[in-house]
Every structure is written in C-alpha cells, then in structure tokens.
Amino acid sequence: MPSVIETQDLRKNYGTHRAVRGLNLHVPAGSICAFLGQNGAGKSSTLRMLLGMARPTSGTGHIFGLRIDNEQDSLKIRQRAAFVAEDKRLYDYMTVAEIIRFTRSFFPNWRSDLEARLLDQFELPLDRKIRKLSKGMRTKLALLLGFARGSELLILDEPTEGLDPVAIEEVLQIIVSLVLDGATIFFSSHQIAEVEQIADHVLMIHRGQLVLDAPMDQVKEQYRHVQAVFPDFVSEQDFRLPGVERVSADGRIVTLVASCNVDAIVSHAHRMHADSVDVLPISLKEIFLEKVRAGK
C-alpha cells in the first residue's frame, strides 16, 4: 500500500535536547494510523515538522510526495491536509457561525453536508462567542473545522482531549466514516483504548525513536504473554530467543512477552521439559508499557 506520509532519518534538536532521533515513518494511504507516545516522546515535534511549522535538524520527509522542508511544497501540503492541534486555538472574538463561515471560504472542497451534521450532532451554539465555549465545545468546534474541509489527509493531535465519553465515541465514529470516504487519518494520542478501537496501523515513539511500526491486526495476532512452569530452576538466558521482548525467571516459572515466533518459543519450552505452557493475548496498553520499560 502506498504511503501518504514518509520520513527518512528525521531528526529535531532543541539545543542539546534530541527531541526526534532518526524517525522513519510510513503512514499507509487510506489508513487510520495512530501515533502513540508518552508526553515529551517527540510526537508534537514530529507533527510540527510534517506541517512545515518547524524545520528538521536533519533527515527528510514527504507528504503526497512533496517535501516537508520546502516552503512551496509545504503550502501545497497544507492545501490538501487538515491539522487539528492539541491546544485547539481559535479566534476567541468570533462566534461559532462566523469562524465556520470564515474557514469555509478558504477550502473549495468544503463539505457543507458534514458541517450541518456535526453542528447538529455536537450541539454547537452558532451565535455564541468562542471565548464563552467550554473546553469540550472548543474541541468539537475545532474538529468540525478540520473534518469539514474535505481534505485527503487529516493530522490530529490528541483529537478527543477534553471530551466526555459520549462525545469521544461520536468523534471516533466520524473518523471511521471519513476514511470510508477516502481520507487518511494520522492522529497522535495517549488514549490507548481509543487507538485500539479504531486504528488499523500503529506507530509507537519513545524518546524520539520509533519502537513499533505495524498493522494493528499483526500486533494483536503476534504479541503474546507466555508463561512456562518447569520441574527445576531455569535461567532467563535459556529464553533469550528471537521474538522475545522481555523475559523474567522466578525459580521454576518463566514469564515472557513475545512479539513473534510464539510457536517456536513454546516448542523450545517443551524441549526443556516444561510441565505446562500457557499462551495469552496481550493488550495494546501492555505492549506500550513494555516498549517504554525497554527504552529506559
């Protein structure tokens, strides 16, 4: 599948702080691609570089085949991509109706049908000044302004921040519908349950480096907890095998997390005369925590 977003060895330094360290991203066209990481992991710096808001220290990146560090290309990218920032900055002196009308004037592919549906669904008060909106209402308005542009690519930074559970579910379903209409979604989040619900591709970043890049189905199929019980004491070294992300031994019990080769690992345990071997699924949250621990 072709990539809408690609980066090669992308780096961003702020003085001596290396915020992004050699990032190689590939966001498949037509996907809902989640960008997971702790606060300070490099997500926002990456998004800023992709959108031409910050220049890379080194490395390259392309969106729609256009260079992210070229001023003319960056303008073309922003004509075809919508960005909803985490801080949801809006013109506070305008009313809801005024900012919608103002934003609509810049985008020839504006979807008036979606605008009307979201106004009703989000219950946004057209005559209210933006400065008088609650945090949740501001988030809904910012999402409406991004979603209705009719863009090929939507880049969303913490899109559900400040929303209640009902509104979150509404937003997630809208994201799915936009992809069905042909858009690509690239969104950063630390809300892992939401990611697990809708994403079909997941990227994890830790301390500026990519630690996972895989289709969600593959992650769910391949990652497993394995626990084996042996008749005698065993060593962790006996299970330093391909595909083992982490292993711990406590007397006769070995517990490990595997990212692949689970059948081979189970066979190895049986060859070592394991009394029992249990294989269990692992959640995306647990995988994320494993990646963070491994990076410390």
Question: Language-model segments: what does each one mean?
Answer:
Residues 11, 97, 192, 233, ...:
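Alpha-helix N-cap/helix-start and coil->helix boundary motif
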Residues 151-159, 233-235, 263-266:
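Short, surface-exposed beta-strand/loop "edge" segments at domain boundaries and coil↔beta transitions
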Residues 22, 223, 244, 274-276:
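A broad structural signal for short, well-ordered beta-strand segments within beta-sheet-rich domains
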Residues 2-7, 12-206, 211-212:
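ABC transporter nucleotide-binding domains
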Residues 170-260:
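ABC transporter nucleotide-binding domain
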Residues 158, 230, 281:
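Residues that line or immediately flank small-molecule/substrate-binding pockets and catalytic motifs
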Residues 102, 117, 218, 267-268:
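Generic structural signal for isolated residues within well-ordered alpha-helices
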Residues 257-296:
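C-terminal coupling/interaction segments
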